[in-house]
C-alpha cells in the first residue's frame, strides 16, 4: 500500500482511473491504496446482510441487468422492487408537485404504495425562522419556508422503506436525508435556471457559461434582499427617555385659630 501523500491531490486530479479495471498502475496519491483499514471495513459490510449491503448489491445487480437501457425513473422503481419495498415515500418540492404526482402514479402502477409530502408542509412563515420579510421572494406576503425535517418525520411515522427526493432545494435535501430513517435516493435534482438539469452548467462552462469559472463575475444578489439583510443585522435603536421631573409637593394649608 502506498503511503498517504502530504498533498491535496485526489480523484478529481487523476487521469489513470486504475480503480475501475485495475489494468494500469495506481498514481502515488491514489486514495485506494492510502486507506486500507477503511477499505476492508467497507468491503465487509457490503458483503453482509446489513442495509448497506442490500442497497449496494441491489444497485450493482440493476447496473448489470439494465446498463444503458433504463431511465432514472424506471431504474428507481426496479431498485425499489429488488429491495422488496412495499411503501415508498416521496419528498417533493411544491414547484414540482405535478411531476411528483405523476411519478407516484407510475410507482403505484408497479404495485408499490406511495405517500407524497411537499416541502411547504406545516405552512411555517419564513419570518418565524428569523428571516427578514425583505428576504422573501414576495415581501409582505405569507411565504412558508421549506420544512424538510417535517417531511422526513411524516414519512418516518408512515413507515416508508425507501424515500425518493423530487426537486428539494440545495441544503434542504441535506436536512431531509439527515432526518430520514429510511434510505433516501434522488429522482429529480432542482435547478431553477437550467430546467432541473444542473450538469448543463458544466457542459457549457468553458464558453457560454464561463462565468462560473470566475468568482468576480458571479451574479450580485437582489438589491432588496441585501438591504433587508443589512437592516436585520443593525441593532435596534433605543432612545433613552429622560426621567420625569419630580412634581413639587404642596405644603398642607395651616388653619388660623381665632384668638
Predicted segments with their positions:
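Long, charge-dense
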Residues: 98-148
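Active-site glycine-rich loop that binds ribose-phosphate moieties when present
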Residues: 143-157, 168-170
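Short, flexible loop segments at boundaries between secondary-structure elements
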Residues: 181-214
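Intrinsically disordered, polybasic Lys/Arg-rich low-complexity tracts
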Residues: 222-259
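Electropositive, gly/pro-rich neighborhoods at or near active sites that engage anionic ligands
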Residues: 2-87, 94-99
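Short glycine-rich or small-residue beta-strand-to-loop segments that form or flank ligand, phosphate
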Residues: 84-92, 116-120, 162-166
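Gly/Ser/Thr-rich loops at beta-strand to alpha-helix junctions
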Residues: 66-70, 92-100, 123, 166-174
Amino acid at each position: 500500500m502506498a503511503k498517504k501523500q502530504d498533498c491535496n491531490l485526489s480523484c478529481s486530479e487523476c487521469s489513470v482511473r486504475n480503480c475501475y479495471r485495475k489494468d494500469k498502475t495506481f498514481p502515488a496519491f491514489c486514495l485506494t491504496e492510502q486507506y486500507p483499514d477503511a477499505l476492508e471495513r467497507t468491503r465487509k459490510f457490503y458483503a453482509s446482510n446489513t442495509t448497506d449491503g442490500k442497497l449496494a448489491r441491489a444497485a450493482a445487480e440493476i447496473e448489470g441487468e439494465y446498463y444503458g437501457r433504463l431511465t432514472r425513473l424506471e431504474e428507481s422503481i426496479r431498485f425499489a422492487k429488488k429491495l422488496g419495498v412495499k411503501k415508498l415515500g416521496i419528498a417533493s418540492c411544491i414547484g414540482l408537485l405535478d411531476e411528483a404526482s405523476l411519478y407516484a402514479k407510475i410507482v403505484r402502477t408497479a404495485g408499490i404504495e406511495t405517500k407524497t409530502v411537499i416541502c411547504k408542509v406545516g405552512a411555517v412563515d419564513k419570518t418565524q425562522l428569523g428571516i427578514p420579510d425583505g428576504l422573501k421572494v414576495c415581501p409582505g406576503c405569507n411565504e412558508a419556508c421549506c420544512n424538510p425535517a417535517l417531511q422526513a418525520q411524516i414519512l418516518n411515522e408512515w413507515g416508508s422503506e425507501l424515500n425518493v427526493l423530487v426537486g428539494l432545494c440545495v441544503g434542504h435535501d441535506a436536512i431531509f436525508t439527515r432526518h430520514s430513517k429510511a434510505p433516501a435516493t434522488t429522482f429529480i435534482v432542482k435547478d431553477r435556471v437550467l430546467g432541473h438539469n444542473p450538469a448543463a452548467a458544466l457542459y457549457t462552462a468553458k464558453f457560454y457559461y464561463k462565468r462560473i469559472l470566475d468568482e468576480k463575475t458571479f451574479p450580485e444578489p437582489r438589491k432588496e434582499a441585501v438591504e433587508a439583510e443589512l437592516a436585520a443585522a443593525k441593532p435596534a435603536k433605543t432612545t433613552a427617555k429622560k426621567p420625569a421631573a419630580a412634581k413639587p409637593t404642596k405644603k398642607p394649608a395651616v388653619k388660623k385659630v381665632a384668638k
